[in-house]
């Protein structure tokens, strides 16, 4: 059992809470039973799993630990409660924290089915919002989520947490805006941009064909280049005083409108 806060592996985990270290070491953190379970189900390779039985909250936690330990490439280490508290990113942890290699998440690896449904996030600033978007995208059955803002860190531990691990269960890609626009054009994927000043309501857009729902920043919206690239611009109606709604809520509304339209489509 690791009991020293000065242990090299403990220090590495603490470093990985910072983006620059995640990027330089090409490793990231996964904390929590549900999140680690979904990572394992998605065949994410676990390099190390740190456990603190004192914090276990589920009767089947040890089963997951044994499942990870069965991988010859994974190291499982028990740690003291003080050490785990030092490494943990969240409050009320359930005693499991894993280190895994950062995925490439390339656009070229993303499958494009006929009439695919995608979501493009151009500037989601808050990890909690991005995690919620991923969770909604998973629930709506999207074919992929594309993140194209250099300032957005998909591997932030709070993104993983807010997504409830669904970041591992749906296809995700990261690329610069120009590459994303070329990719969408190459695959004939229509761009439906969410813009508060659009003339049309979101329910008027045809989301039954291959399309990508485009979301910008809550504060500044979509930039000129993205607006010029959009095939359709739509807004969510608002009868209150707020000039915009939370970007994750907007994503959820539009994704489930797309799902509703597709469900009503007659099958061939």
Give the label of every model feature segment.
Residues 95-99, 163, 210-215:
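Short basic, glycine-rich beta-strand/loop surfaces that mediate nucleic-acid
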Residues 2, 28, 122-123, 148-149, ...:
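Glycine- and other small-residue-rich loops at beta-strand/loop junctions that grip anionic moieties
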Residues 192-242, 246:
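Active-site/ligand-binding-proximal alpha/beta "capping" segment
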Residues 98, 136-140, 151-167, 224-268:
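Structured adenosyl-cofactor binding patch, chiefly the S-adenosyl-L-methionine
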Residues 34, 41, 66, 71, ...:
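RNA substrate-binding interface of SAM-dependent RNA methyltransferases
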Residues 1-89:
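N-terminal positively charged helical leader segments and presequences
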Residues 33, 54-56, 83, 102-104, ...:
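Short glycine-rich anion-binding loops that position phosphate/pyrophosphate groups of nucleotides
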């Amino acid at each position: 059992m690791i009991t020293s806060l000065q242990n090299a592996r403990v220090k590495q985990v603490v470093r990985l809470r910072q983006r620059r270290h995640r990027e330089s070491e090409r490793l990231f953190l996964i904390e929590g039973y549900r999140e680690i379970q979904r990572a394992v189900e998605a065949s994410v390779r676990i390099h190390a799993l740190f456990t603190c039985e004192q914090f276990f909250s589920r009767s089947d936690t040890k089963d997951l630990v044994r499942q990870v330990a069965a991988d010859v490439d994974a190291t499982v280490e028990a740690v003291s409660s003080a050490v785990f508290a030092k490494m943990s990113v969240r409050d009320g942890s359930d005693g499991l924290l894993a280190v895994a290699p950062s995925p490439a998440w390339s656009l070229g690896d993303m499958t494009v089915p006929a009439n695919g449904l995608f979501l493009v996030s151009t500037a989601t600033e808050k990890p909690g919002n991005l995690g919620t978007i991923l969770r909604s995208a998973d629930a709506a059955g999207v074919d992929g989520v594309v993140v194209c803002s250099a300032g957005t860190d998909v591997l932030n531990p709070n993104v993983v947490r807010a997504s409830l691990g669904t970041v591992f269960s749906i296809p995700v890609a990261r690329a610069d805006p120009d590459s994303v626009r070329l990719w969408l054009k190459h695959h004939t994927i229509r761009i439906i941009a969410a813009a508060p000043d659009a003339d049309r309501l979101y329910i008027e857009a045809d989301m039954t064909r291959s399309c990508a729902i485009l979301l910008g920043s809550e504060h500044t919206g979509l930039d000129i280049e993205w607006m010029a690239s959009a095939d359709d611009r739509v807004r969510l109606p608002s009868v209150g005083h707020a000039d915009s709604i939370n970007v994750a809520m907007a994503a959820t509304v539009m994704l489930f409108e797309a799902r509703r339209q597709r469900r009503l489509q007659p099958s061939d």
